[in-house]
């Protein structure tokens, strides 16, 4: 299970999801815990933003139009080795979780995400 409690209190979290309402909700939740949050609505947008400003953690949707969350994770690891990535999905299956874990993602969460799963 992922936990943000190991991050320093003012850590920067990069949130990536193609669902605008989820981006807004998760951003508010994370900011209320003291984290700095940046967002992107696509994996490609996230990579562009990460090139400008690094994050302490990336929290990304698995299934997005264009590049998916696992491909984003692989690109992040090739450019910023060791940056932790948590993959989240509304349609999580055991094979998805196994693939994500074998790829080396920090954690895999199924939406809706319970506040206790993160903090």
List where the protein language model places each region.
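Active-site residues of response regulator receiver
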Residues: 17, 61, 89
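Non-catalytic signal-transmission and effector/linker regions of two-component phosphorelay proteins
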Residues: 1-14
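The feature encodes the CheY-like receiver
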Residues: 23, 65, 93
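Charged docking surfaces used in two-component/phosphorelay signaling
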Residues: 24-32
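Short amphipathic alpha-helix used as the core "switch/output" element in two-component signaling
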Residues: 48, 70-81, 99
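Acidic catalytic/metal-coordinating carboxylates
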Residues: 41-45, 68-71
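Active-site beta3 strand of CheY-like receiver
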Residues: 53-59
């Amino acid at each position: 299970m992922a936990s943000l409690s190991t991050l320093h209190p003012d850590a920067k979290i990069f949130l990536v999801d193609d669902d605008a309402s989820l981006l807004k909700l998760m951003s508010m939740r994370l900011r209320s815990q003291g984290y700095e949050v940046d967002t992107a609505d696509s994996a490609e947008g996230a990579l562009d933003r990460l090139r400008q400003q690094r994050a302490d953690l990336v929290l990304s949707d698995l299934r997005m139009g264009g590049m998916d969350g696992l491909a984003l994770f692989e690109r992040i690891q090739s450019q910023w080795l060791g940056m932790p990535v948590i993959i989240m999905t509304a349609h999580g299956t055991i094979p998805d979780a196994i693939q994500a874990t074998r790829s080396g993602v920090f954690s895999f969460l199924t939406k809706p995400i319970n506040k206790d799963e993160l903090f």
